[in-house]
Amino acid sequence: MLKLLVFMQINSNIGLVLEGGGMRGVFTSGVLDAFMKHDVFFRYIVGVSAGACNGLSYMSRQPRRAKISNIDMLAKYDYIGLRHLVTQGCILDPELLYNKFPYEIVPFDYDTYFANIRRGDVFEIVTTNCLTGRSEYLQERDGNSHRLNELARATSSLPYVCKIVDIGGQPMLDGGIADSIPIERAIATGHSKNVVICTRNKGWRDKGKDHKQPRFVYRNYPRLRVLLSRRLKFYNEQLDMVDRLEAENSILVIRPEKEIVVGRMEKDIRKLENLYEEGVVLGNRFIKEHLSKLTAPY
């Protein structure tokens, strides 16, 4: 159903950047639900992996849809697990998530999504091109619902545990491999100020070590292997950039304040509910503290 809303427009030079993080993305869905409750909508959004998937329901103006998909339906359908890797080549159930959910079980409002696109809103989905080893920032502006679903699938296809997804003849995987927090993309597209929703606590860094990928791993994609071999270092550098830009007042960051206890493939419903609710609380607080700086009458 097409929904026409009257709202306060975020200034056009301010973008919204959505980090991924698997099931930690329920925090992002909580923040975005708070934004929708107050009719606060950004005109430019760039999202990665779970961030992009949650952002789709924000662009379609469907409060709680992402929460229902990520938490309520997880308890019912158990769509994370090795059995899906064996039967469908992905640790997440792609047929359920990118076909049955949007078309049948938790219907996605394609009419409203594409109406917002036609009026000039931009929603970029980050994927990693396995041939080039570079990030790509893809859109679906022509009303093709199947392609939009495939973009969501591609940006969420984790290396090693998900099949490569073909997008227009190009092999794609999770956008977080090449660009986990696409602030530089938002700046490059003319957005001098940005709001960034992160899914890690302030100060967190990955303490693991990068390892050179053996040749038998993605043997047809040597540039992807190189990228995977230095992924942790690059992600930590992006977190450093977030802190630096935040200190310079170039960006506003919304991130969990309580210690994160939700894993990438978390299935504990109580933990997920708590993180979602924290997102709602911090989203409401952000609006109260910062909305006047970001909006103009629309």
Spans of model-derived segments:
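Patatin-like phospholipase
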Residues: 1-48, 56-298
